[in-house]
Structures are given as structure tokens and as C-alpha cells.
Amino acid sequence: MGNRNLIRFDWAIKRLLRNKADFTVLEGFLSELLKENISIDSVLESESNQKFSRDKFNRVDILVKNSKGEIAIIEIQNENEYDYFHRMAYGTSKVITEYIAVGEPYKNIKKVYSINIVYFDLGQGADYIYHGKTDFIGIHKSDKLKLSTKQSELLGGKTEPY
């Protein structure tokens, strides 16, 4: 096979899918990945400012807001980073704090999906797509923590913390 110029997925994400006309492609990708219908409202500013000199700079490849007000971070990483899980946690936390105002109730925190496409082994496993989430499991009874009736009412009928 000769030299062919192929478009890499990271190039497409960073350049093509930022256009509103191409949102259907991104919506289809996210809908399949998250197993629910996703409708993108807007592409958000993907670079956060450092508030203090000691803050880490956070830049993601694409940041979108869906019709439910939830945020999806799509990050493409070519270079091996052994502490990439920590980077995911930092990036997600930073986005959460940037989208809630001082004095706003914590119930207004938006759900953030962190979608990471990496071109290296992230860990050891047989699959190539993994879904991680935060669950609270009891130490003694191994039950999954659910919200109380009052908490559920406050959060619009949700039964789980996230």
C-alpha cells in the first residue's frame, strides 16, 4: 500500500466537528457511546484560564453542552501518560467547578462526561472501550448507596447520586 493521506479521528474532532453543521456526526458518536439520544446545543470554550499561578492549565480537544445542560469533554491523547487517570479526574473536576457560580446550590452541578480516546494502553484489559462511573458501595453489606426521598425530590426524581 502506497503513501496515503488519511484523516485521523483527532484531526476530525478538533477541526470538523466544531461546526454546527457537523453536530449530527458528533451527536451520533456520543449517542452510541453513551447509549442515549444526545442533542448538542453548543460547543463551549475548551481552554480554562488559570485563576492562580499555581493552577494547572486545562485544555481539552472539544467541550460540548447537550440539550439537558450536561457537559461532555472529549480528549484525544497521542502520547503515553502513565498518570492519565489523574489527568481525567483533574480535567473533569476543573470543568465542574467552572460551570457553577459562587452561591449557587450544589444541586445545580452539571453532569460531566469525560470521553477519552487514547492511542496507547491505558491499563491492562481485554476490551478496547471502557465505561467508568462513580458508585458508592457499602463496605459491610456491598449494597449500592441510593438517595433518600428528600434528596431525590431535591434532584428532580433521581435515585442515584450521579
Give the label of every model feature segment.
Residues 1-162:
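Elongated, amphipathic alpha-helical interaction scaffolds
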